[in-house]
Amino acid sequence: MSISSLAITVDFSADFGAARSQGRRPTCLAFAASDCHAHAVGNGCGELSVEFAFYHAVERMVAKDRSTGVNFGAISTALGVDGQPNEEGWPYIPDLGPADDWSPPVDPGDIFHGKLGRMSLDLGSVRDELDKGIPVLLIMDVSKSFFQPAAGRIINAASTERAEGIHAVIAVGYGHLENAASYLVRNSWGEKWGSNGYAWLHEDYLEPRLRVAGVFSQEVQTL
């Protein structure tokens, strides 16, 4: 399915710019949550510190293992309780090793706290949030078709295509083609994935693979 035939209803990817890269670290959820949080803060706050968010989410996991990912509850609690500063307060460390020193700076600057909550997995509810200009955090299974999107094409594959892992992205738009919706997602695999780090997912690909959806309250506290 060609993107050129898609009737786009909402697209606020320009609010974010080109996607960043998480490298080989399991930080996709921290990237997705940080981008959604920064959008909720608004006022040109810039990028928020993924490192700070991931550190505090890891601290809230039972194993406290930086080499594995974190779950929705951990990142949600971390951003609500611990918050996060701007990226400059603790820049991302793409090559952090398992035994490297790792602790937040004493004075990272202003801290932004946000309330990230779960929402319905119904894709109609996702579209409702996008219609309001609110990005939606998505945690989903990903299969082979997700890893190398064909240029100018909408990602789609049978629900039987084997899952290769669980990944977090954010939805920043949607459109329709032949009475079916597709969703524009922002990834954290750098600009070489998709189109500058973005790609379209057909509803038939997303719906059976979606595990968690979440949005930030638009009420943000700064300390």
Give the label of every model feature segment:
Residues S13-A14, H56-R60:
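Acidic/histidine-rich, surface-exposed loop or edge segments in extracytoplasmic proteins
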Residues A38-F54:
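Phosphate-handling active-site elements
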Residues C28:
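Short cysteine clusters
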